[in-house]
Amino acid sequence: MARTVNCVKLKREAEGLDYPPYPGELGARIWREISKESWEEWKQIQTRLVNENRLNLADARARKYLQQQMERFLFEDGTVEAQGYVPPSA
């Protein structure tokens, strides 16, 4: 049986993650409070942020920026998107 969480992003019960996706206390919080659906949505946004902003993940500032954007997206109801990103038309 799949683990469910009360996802703070979706504001409803949803399937939880199988394991903490990030190290430390933040990873444990994500595991407790964020659904698989919200995490997958974040991973797509994260990819766009890295690509559109040409972030170098070896740079500590880039990693800090991504962590801030992740927390904003997952826990603060913030809209996060890469500057200049245009979604494909339907």
From Swiss-Prot:
It holds the Pfam family Iron_traffic. Keywords: Iron. InterPro entries: Fe_traffick_prot_YggX (IPR007457), Fe_traffick_prot_YggX_sf (IPR036766). GO terms for biological process: cellular response to oxidative stress. GO terms for cellular component: cytosol. It comes from the Bacteria. One of its GO terms (molecular function) is iron ion binding. Belongs to the Fe(2+)-trafficking protein family. Could be a mediator in iron transactions between iron acquisition and iron-requiring processes, such as synthesis and/or repair of Fe-S clusters in biosynthetic enzymes. This is Probable Fe(2+)-trafficking protein.
